[in-house]
């Protein structure tokens, strides 16, 4: 059990016959009236987002989420195949289940599959990945004073913005949470 006053980003709760993840929360103490917690919740199955206000003492059951290490094997049409590296069990997920969470993940890399009661609802890629730039325009030295970027396509097909000094064939590090360039590899 957790009360609304103890909300943290990322926790999952059971609310209104569903499993919801707290995306954002804010403690509000108005000048008049009692304090409340304003929270933005995301349904982990449907992906729907709601905003709601709760009394800080309102109690919720925590939902148990399994995060298991799996190896991303390959894509076969609209199915993406993963293997549990401990049990060697394989699982195939549809493109709808995967979404764009694999846009920075190469085949044979490790990911975490998040599930509730056996139903996979999210894929957590590694926080930082190294990828090769397959396509980008050449950067012209002296074009700018600071911080200029250009579009680049990496080996997984994802498009990101990189600094001008990055060239085709360079290996770069990308933060998968934001999709931003972090450094050269």
Swiss-Prot record:
Pathway: Protein biosynthesis; polypeptide chain elongation
Pfam families: EFP (PF01132), EFP_N (PF08207), Elong-fact-P_C (PF09285)
Compartments in which it is found: Cytoplasm
GO molecular function: translation elongation factor activity
InterPro entries attached to this UniProt entry: Elong-fact-P_C, NA-bd_OB-fold, Rib_uL2_dom2, Transl_elong_fac_P/YeiP, Transl_elong_KOW-like, Transl_elong_P/YeiP_cen, Transl_elong_P/YeiP_CS, Transl_elongation_fac_P
Swiss-Prot/TrEMBL GO biological process terms: peptide biosynthetic process
Key words of the record: Cytoplasm, Elongation factor, Protein biosynthesis
Superkingdom as given in the UniProt entry: Bacteria
PROSITE patterns (alphabetical): EFP
Family according to the record: Belongs to the elongation factor P family.
Role: Involved in peptide bond synthesis. Stimulates efficient translation and peptide-bond synthesis on native or reconstituted 70S ribosomes in vitro. Probably functions indirectly by altering the affinity of the ribosome for aminoacyl-tRNA, thus increasing their reactivity as acceptors for peptidyl transferase.
NCBIfam families according to UniProt: efp, PRK00529.1
Name of this chain's protein: Elongation factor P
